[in-house]
Amino acid sequence: MACPYLGSGELTHRVTFMEGGEECQQGVNKVEMGFGQTYSEYLQLDKILTAQRLKSEADGQRVDDEHLFIVIHQAHELWFKQIIFDLDNVRKLLNNTIVDETKTLKIVSGLDRMTKILSLLTEQITLLDTMSPLDFVDFRKYLTPASGFQSLQFRVLENKLGVRQERRIKYNAQHYKNVFNDTDLKTLNVTEEEKSLLTLIESWLERTPGLKSTSEDEGFWIKYEKSVNKYLADLAKQAADPSNTEEIAKQLTAEYHKTADAFQSILDPRQHEQHIRNGNRLLSHDATKGAMMIYFYRDMPRFSQPYQILTFLMDIDSLFTKWRYNHVLLVQRMLGAKQGTGGSSGYMYLRSTVSDRYKVFLDLFNLSTWLIPREYIPMLSPRMVKTLSEHSNLSHSQSSESD
């Protein structure tokens, strides 16, 4: 049977036949013709595939698992490079006084790819569990003083995301930069000085449309405060219901006061600022209000992609936490309570990093504290419905064309 992709006409090149005499599609071997570069040349595989040099083998005591150990860590560094590449593109799109809303899909796509890579890494690191602790001991001596703590790209990634220096856990009671040389320190200093993703997201959220009151609309936050007060009043009414037993009344009253205190901490700007100073919150009050508005009205066309952005930011934090946790379990399994190859306290140090201190977008997780039932969510004015139904950049472009 003739291959359907050949079409009519004479055959001028070689044709390969499948088993049974079935023709495959016509093709040309461009390598034989000297056309362009090969797959191996394009990917520079001669460099990549010769970079797995086993120290144990050079010492005449080859340990096969060292090969896996090297490949896993090299693969991590390649993926870190891709995440940083995508992160820089996202930061570039956000680093504008007015973010082009027609570009938010690119931001969403970039963050989506980052989460997929991080998801892959959380699974990839578990491949090291296929080594036995005894096999690891056989080649561990060749690693000293090399340590994953010295991964420049991982620290660059943390800084570009927005991990605050004051929130870092001390490494052997020292600053994290002490393990890097002068060239690497310059790179790290630049990443500490430039705007992180957290800073850019904060500025973007502060400009959420409809957040502030105008002559035409009183704004989201004023309406939200009124709705919260109504919600709290209803909770107080439930607690004071004469039909409640003494025990139920006590529980409902305690719940009311706890809920009221939680809402007061976000409604009062001074309390919010105090939480920032205490290190419990990272986003400004206006940025937090913007995120709240996006949460409540995520079904509006103009907020659908911003809501996805906020979701992916939390996914990034979650996946980093999962990766750190998997790493901790791996180290505990392989080393127990031994000191790390770089001189750290090993398991104990790594376990301390699996905490909210390293969550860049912790405030987004905590937004659920101040969500109110749907029946209390403030209604949007007709003017605001129109505003949130049209992308500002698209509307401006269309009006310019009509002019």
Swiss-Prot record:
Tissue specificity statement from the Swiss-Prot or TrEMBL entry: Expressed in body wall muscle cells, hypodermis, PLM neurons and touch-receptor neurons.
InterPro entries: Trp/Indoleamine_2_3_dOase-like (IPR037217), Trp_2_3_dOase (IPR004981)
Catalyzed chemical reaction(s): L-tryptophan + O2 = N-formyl-L-kynurenine
Top-level class of the enzyme under EC nomenclature: oxidoreductase
UniProt GO BP: L-tryptophan catabolic process to acetyl-CoA; L-tryptophan catabolic process to kynurenine
Cofactor (UniProt): heme
Disruption-associated phenotype: RNAi-mediated knockdown of the protein increases longevity and causes a delayed and extended reproductive life span without increasing total progeny. Animals show increased levels of tryptophan, reduced sensitivity to proteotoxic aggregates of alpha-synuclein and reduced age-related decline of motility. A double knockdown of tdo-2 together with an enzyme downstream in the kynurenine pathway, kmo-1, flu-2, afmd-1 or haao-1, causes an increase in motility and tryptophan levels and suppresses the proteotoxicity similarly to knock-down of tdo-2 alone.
Its EC number(s): 1.13.11.11
Pathway involvement of the protein, from the record: Amino-acid degradation; L-tryptophan degradation via kynurenine pathway; L-kynurenine from L-tryptophan: step 1/2
Binding site for heme: H327
Motif (PLD motif): 133-135
An annotated Gene Ontology molecular function: heme binding
Cofactor descriptive note: Binds 1 heme group per subunit.
Cross-referenced Pfam families: Trp_dioxygenase
Keywords, ordered alphabetically: Dioxygenase, Heme, Iron, Metal-binding, Oxidoreductase, Tryptophan catabolism
Binding positions for substrate per the UniProt entry: F69, I70, V71, I72, H73, R140, T341
HAMAP family xref list: T23O (MF_01972)
PANTHER family named in the record: TRYPTOPHAN 2,3-DIOXYGENASE
General function of this protein: Heme-dependent dioxygenase that catalyzes the oxidative cleavage of the L-tryptophan (L-Trp) pyrrole ring and converts L-tryptophan to N-formyl-L-kynurenine. Catalyzes the oxidative cleavage of the indole moiety. Involved in regulation of protein homeostasis, longevity and reproducive life span. Specifically regulates proteotoxicity due to age-related aggregation of proteins like alpha-synuclein, via its effects on tryptophan metabolism.
Family to which the UniProt record says this protein belongs: Belongs to the tryptophan 2,3-dioxygenase family.
Oligomeric form and interacting partners: Homotetramer. Dimer of dimers.
Identification of the protein by name: Tryptophan 2,3-dioxygenase
UniProt source species: Caenorhabditis elegans
